């Protein structure tokens, strides 16, 4: 994703002491670009009051990889389970490792949150403590609370096949029908339910208020939505769990205004239960 390419370039350049001045200039340029792109990183940290902050696992750092889509989707799954009182901390490195077996995967390792769901169902998953680095061999067994699982069995225990629904809002496509999300990162050609943006926003807000895990993306980045806040002027924001580590103005959280959500969102993933509001609801509106 574009933002992550710029971030990786910045990290590479700052290695050289001779390039310190240019690195500082590049950092300022990128900071400005990122703020303009999705307005989650303000030039000066603002004060936010949290209205809802759902439970989450510790903030992780994707480093120089372009795998935010893995971190964001797994973070949403983790928050979903924490809401049930079921503690689970999943390894993004396991999914990244499995990409080596996917011939369609680009060298950049870019993808969609729905790609994470497909890989999780196909290859399984393990706990974070069992695989903290992509260079670590993927475990053949998962040991959890005295039980032993294969990675596939463990994956089914944390994310049932078909449990999540992918949503998008595209005025050029029929609403309430499934269509392919036409972005380069959707190399598995996954299909999303297309709904009006006002409906997508309302579904997302309700899901967060009901403590569900939600995965969000714009054209440059993906994060998990973990809460709702407002600033001192009363403007409302979604609280995002990012995957760029904790050495940031808000300790690894970011804030996307409701208005910016409506302008930049290209897709959201949540459980079908969160989407319906209750199980079995016949009315998607």
Identify the residue ranges that each predicted region occupies:
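Compositionally biased, intrinsically disordered low-complexity segments enriched in Pro/Arg/Gln/His
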Residues: 28-29
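Active-site signature of cysteine proteases
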Residues: 57, 146-285
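Cross-family signature of deubiquitinases and ubiquitin-like deconjugating cysteine proteases
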Residues: 42-43, 55-83, 98
């Amino acid at each position: 994703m574009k933002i992550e390419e710029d971030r990786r370039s910045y990290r590479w350049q700052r290695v050289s002491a001779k390039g310190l001045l240019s690195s500082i200039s590049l950092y300022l340029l990128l900071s400005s670009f990122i703020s303009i792109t999705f307005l989650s990183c303000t030039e000066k940290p603002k004060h936010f009051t949290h209205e809802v902050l759902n439970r989450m696992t510790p903030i992780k750092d994707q480093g120089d990889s372009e795998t935010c889509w893995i971190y964001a989707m797994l973070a949403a799954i983790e928050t979903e389970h924490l809401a049930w009182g079921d503690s689970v901390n999943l390894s993004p490195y396991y999914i990244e490792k499995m990409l080596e077996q996917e011939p369609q995967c680009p060298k950049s390792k870019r993808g969609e949150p729905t790609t994470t769901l497909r890989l999780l169902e196909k290859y399984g998953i393990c706990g974070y403590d069992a695989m903290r680095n992509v260079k670590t061999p993927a475990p053949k067994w998962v040991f959890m609370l005295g039980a032993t699982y294969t990675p596939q069995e463990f994956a089914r225990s944390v994310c049932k096949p078909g449990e999540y629904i992918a949503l998008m809002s595209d005025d050029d496509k029929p609403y309430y029908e499934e269509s392919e999300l036409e972005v380069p990162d959707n190399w598995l050609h996954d299909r999303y339910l297309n709904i009006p943006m006002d409906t997508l926003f309302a579904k997302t807000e309700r899901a967060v208020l009901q403590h569900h895990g939600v995965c969000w993306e714009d054209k440059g980045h993906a994060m998990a939505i973990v809460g709702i806040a407002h600033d001192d002027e009363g403007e409302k924001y979604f609280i995002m769990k990012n995957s760029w580590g904790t050495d940031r103005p808000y300790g690894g959280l970011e804030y996307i205004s409701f208005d910016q959500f409506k302008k930049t969102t290209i897709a959201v993933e949540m459980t079908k239960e969160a989407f319906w509001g209750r199980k079995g609801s016949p009315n998607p509106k």
